[in-house]
Design a protein with these regions (language model features):
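Bacterial N-terminal signal peptides that target proteins for export
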Residues: 1-12
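Flexible coil segments in periplasmic/lumen-exposed cytochrome c-class electron-transfer proteins
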Residues: 29-72, 80, 88, 137-194
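C-terminal segment of classical bacterial N-terminal signal peptides
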Residues: 16-26
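Sec/Tat-exported extracytoplasmic proteins
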Residues: 93-94, 98, 115, 130-134, ...
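Secreted/luminal cysteine- and crosslink-motif detector
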Residues: 4, 95-98, 193
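Sequence/structural segment immediately N-terminal to covalent heme-attachment motifs in c-type
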Residues: 79-100, 125-129
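Gly/Gly-Pro-rich "capping" loops immediately C-terminal to redox-active cysteine motifs
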Residues: 101-129, 144-148
Length: 194
């Protein structure tokens, strides 16, 4: 099952990398992105939390493995656009089962805890194919969202937000500030939602 989920996640990742990455307008105040002036320095990539971005392209930060990651600064008060987008999409699609801020509920587990040992490919595999893990001790069942554009078009963003929460780089509640929405995000969002 894990191999099939990883293959599906790889296909999804390839599609997302080809242009389907973004989310919806946020209400927090936008601020200038660190790499807006052109080149990216090590100081531009410095982030709160244990996971440090290795690269930023079109406002999307990635770690050394190429997985989407957060750029949180100012003691958790300022986030990149994709983390903000993930917050918005999480609250539109995931909060019903997984509770506020990814903390879990009586109905579904904490995603803050689950992401501590989960890479993006595994996360994507569960989102695309769902989960059905039933045994005597527990019943973990999640529907597949592979055909839901409101989730699939924003999957990297949701992962980025939950990763920031899991790493302790972002606290509970809405981030007060965010970097501006990149033009590449809008283009990818439009292409994905068609």
């Amino acid at each position: 099952m894990r191999c099939a989920a990883s293959r599906v996640a790889g296909i999804v990742l390839a599609g997302l990398a080809a242009g389907a990455l973004g989310p919806v307008a946020a209400f927090a105040a936008p601020t200038t992105p660190p790499a807006a002036s052109g080149g990216t320095s090590a100081a531009d990539l410095k982030s709160d939390g244990p996971t440090q971005p290795a690269k930023v392209q079109d406002g999307q930060y990635t770690d050394k493995n190429g997985d989407p990651t957060y750029h949180v600064t100012d003691s958790g008060k300022k986030v990149d656009w994709y983390t903000m987008s993930g917050y918005l999409r999480y609250n539109a699609n995931c909060i019903v089962c997984h509770g506020p801020d990814g903390m879990g509920s009586t109905y579904a587990p904490s995603l803050v805890d689950a992401l501590k040992g989960m890479d993006y490919a595994h996360f994507a595999g569960i989102i695309v194919g769902g989960k059905n893990d039933v045994n005597a001790a527990q019943e973990l069942v999640m529907p597949a969202f592979g055909d839901n554009r409101n989730v699939m078009c924003y999957m990297p963003d949701i992962y980025t937000y939950l990763r920031a929460r899991s790493d302790g780089a972002l606290g509970r509640n809405r981030p007060p500030e965010h970097e501006p929405k990149p033009a590449a995000f809008e283009k990818a969002e439009d292409a994905c939602m068609k």
